UniProtKB/Swiss-Prot annotation:
A GO cellular component annotation in the UniProt record: other organism cell membrane
Additional free-text comment from the UniProt record: Iso and Leu residues are assigned by comparison with orthologs.
Organism: Latrodectus hesperus (Western black widow spider)
Family named by the database record: Belongs to the cationic peptide 01 (latrotoxin) family. 04 (delta-latroinsectotoxin) subfamily.
Domain topic, free-text comment: Two helices (H2 and H8) are predicted to insert into membranes and form pores by assembling into tetramers. The helices are contained within a helical bundle domain that undergoes significant conformational changes during pore formation to allow exposure of the transmembrane helices and transition of the toxin from a soluble monomer to a transmembrane tetramer.
UniProt keyword annotations, A-Z: ANK repeat, Cleavage on pair of basic residues, Exocytosis, Membrane, Neurotoxin, Presynaptic neurotoxin, Repeat, Secreted, Target cell membrane, Target membrane, Toxin, Transmembrane
Name by which UniProt lists this protein: Delta-latroinsectotoxin-Lhe1a
UniProt ANK repeat ranges: 57-59, 66-78, 79-96, 98-125
This protein's record includes keyword Repeat: yes
One Gene Ontology term from the biological process aspect of the record: viral RNA genome replication
Lineage: Eukaryota, Metazoa, Ecdysozoa, Arthropoda, Chelicerata
Length: 147
């Protein structure tokens, strides 16, 4: 199982990348990573809890229609620690909000690939697969085929 430190390192590596991946609608089962997140010292869980308390969103919710999962927020706050959940939620500039969404979704896909490639044996891949929409399943199949 990934440790808090390895997740922290993974996030730092991913945040430095500027990739051109397609952005599938991937629903990560956040509970699978909660234990590794709480093992870190970078405050990711605190940020996630702040968002949960602010927006009352399910930890297993899927990103669509500009709704972020807590994992999206955790990654975004990792890169921008000074930004608060309230400022993001109150942002009425749809173009700016969408632009941020695209950046964070690319990071989420990178993180998803990292776990699939490095910790596949610890994840319930069938459960992950069942949480994807049809487009996500097609794109995940391509990812797995090209591993």
């Amino acid at each position: 199982e990934p440790s808090g430190n390895s997740l922290s390192s993974a996030l730092n590596e991913l945040l430095d990348k500027n990739n051109n991946y397609a952005i599938p609608k991937v629903a990560i089962i956040f509970d699978d990573f909660k234990s590794s997140l709480t093992g870190g010292d970078d405050g990711l869980i605190d940020n996630v809890i702040e968002v949960l308390n602010t927006v009352k969103v399910s930890i297993n919710s899927v990103t669509e229609n500009n709704n972020w999962t807590p994992l999206h927020f955790a990654i975004y706050f990792k890169k921008n620690p000074a930004v608060s959940a309230v400022l993001i939620l109150e942002n009425k500039d749809i173009e700016a909000r969408t632009s941020i969404m695209l950046i964070v979704q690319k990071l989420l896909l990178e993180l998803y690939n990292y776990f699939i490639n490095n910790y596949a044996e610890t994840l319930d891949e069938e459960a992950l697969f069942n949480r994807l929409d049809e487009q996500g399943k097609l794109e995940l199949a391509l990812i797995m085929h090209n591993k």
